[in-house]
Amino acid sequence: MHNYYKIVLIMVAFFAVIITFSNIQVEGAVCNLKRCQLSCRSLGLLGKCIGDKCECVKHGK
């Protein structure tokens, strides 16, 4: 039972870190990464923000 609490604590800490860092935005960044990824995914590509531009690239590059 003690290991169960350790696992739950680790999971809670992990999600807290993920949520915290996902809310941090770089000042002055114009490219919306989530929107970029979604639009490129519809083309079967991977969306990446390079500077203020969204670029669609093949997976594995």
From Swiss-Prot:
GO CC entries: extracellular region
Effect the entry attributes to changing residue 41 to A: 83.0% loss of toxicity. 100% loss of toxicity
Secretion signal, residue range per the UniProt entry: 1-28
One term of GO molecular function: toxin activity
Organism: Olivierus martensii
Name of the molecule in the record: Potassium channel toxin alpha-KTx 5.3
PROSITE patterns: SCORP_SHORT_TOXIN
Compartments (UniProt record): Secreted
